[in-house]
């Protein structure tokens, strides 16, 4: 290991020790040691496996005894809630209206698990195959700094693969309500296509939560008591706004309009609905159209926001989410 690697290692260890002290403040010494061991172990092994963390920790005891100690501490009542409360307190002073809350699905693979509660088949995206494990819903806070951005965890929710979709949606909605109370209704939530869901859209609008969802382009557009074909309505839109693209010689041709989204499961004349903005982006490079239309469903709790501002804010919001994903890949 060269000098630069040693310096980096020492720097990371010092930062982790400092963070561990803050997280475990108020706990007894054994619990404080547990927090530090877990943080160092996860960073050192690259995975949240207690057995591998136990092997990584050098505490002059057997791997078996170290594993038992870690298992004992991780079963402590309200441990997850205490950690999340700490993260909320850590983030709260830094949250502004420009903050993005990035909602991202993931998974934890447990390929050798045979009797773990709730464990089931999940798609392991990193290996592109099905394996045993759990579903994970993460919410990250992307905070604007003077010298760039800071990405901090705001919440992490573990699900059994067998959970009913409506139950998972309710857990997410409860989490958003709690965060909006804690963060004084600041920030914008950003979702990928898997969250293009009428119930979620209705919930966000009804609670005055700003959001951007990448649309799938499949839902009908509600106008009065009539529901119209999405693609046909998009073809009628005027692409009169032009913005710089993400690459050289690239330009976005954009259009937006307010649309109605039915929030009831089944269409009817009395079906409930909410109104949001639809932003459609067409990519042009060197004057030629490239790719398919890109749809963003959004609402910034300001019905009087000018169209160009809606477009620019929606694109910039999703661009920042996309940039974070690229870095993690």
Regions found by a protein language model. Name each.
Residues 10, 25, 52, 62, ...:
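Noncatalytic, typically N-terminal accessory segments of nucleic acid-processing enzymes
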């Amino acid at each position: 290991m060269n000098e630069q690697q040693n310096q980096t290692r020492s720097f990371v260890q010092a930062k982790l020790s400092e963070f561990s002290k803050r997280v475990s403040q108020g706990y007894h010494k054994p619990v404080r040691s547990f927090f530090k061991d877990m943080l160092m172990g996860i960073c050192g092994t690259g995975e949240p496996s207690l057995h591998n963390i136990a092997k990584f920790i050098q505490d002059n005891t057997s791997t078996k005894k170290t594993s038992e100690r870690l298992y004992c501490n991780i079963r402590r009542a309200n441990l997850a809630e205490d950690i999340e409360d700490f993260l909320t307190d850590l983030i709260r002073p830094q949250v502004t209206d420009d903050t993005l809350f990035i909602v991202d699905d993931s998974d934890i693979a447990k390929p050798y698990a045979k009797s773990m509660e709730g464990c089931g088949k999940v798609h392991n995206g990193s290996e592109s195959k099905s394996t045993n494990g759990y579903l994970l819903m993460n919410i990250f806070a992307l905070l604007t700094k003077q010298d760039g951005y800071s990405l901090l965890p705001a919440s992490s929710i573990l699900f059994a693969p067998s959970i009913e979709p409506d139950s998972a949606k309710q857990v997410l909605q409860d989490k958003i309500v709690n965060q909006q109370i804690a963060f004084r209704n600041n920030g914008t939530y950003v979702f990928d296509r898997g969250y293009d869901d009428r119930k979620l859209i209705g919930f966000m609008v009804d609670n005055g939560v700003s959001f951007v969802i990448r649309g799938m382009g499949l839902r009908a557009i509600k106008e009065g008591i009539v529901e119209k074909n999405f693609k046909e309505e998009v073809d009628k839109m005027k692409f009169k706004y032009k913005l710089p693209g993400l690459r050289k010689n690239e330009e976005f041709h954009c259009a937006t309009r307010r649309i109605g989204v039915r929030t009831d499961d089944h269409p009817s004349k009395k079906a409930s609905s909410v109104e949001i903005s639809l932003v459609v982006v067409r990519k042009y490079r060197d004057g030629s159209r490239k790719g398919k239309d890109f749809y963003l469903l959004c609402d910034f709790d300001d019905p009087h926001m000018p169209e160009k501002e809606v477009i620019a804010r929606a694109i910039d919001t999703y661009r920042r989410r996309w940039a974070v994903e690229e870095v993690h890949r």
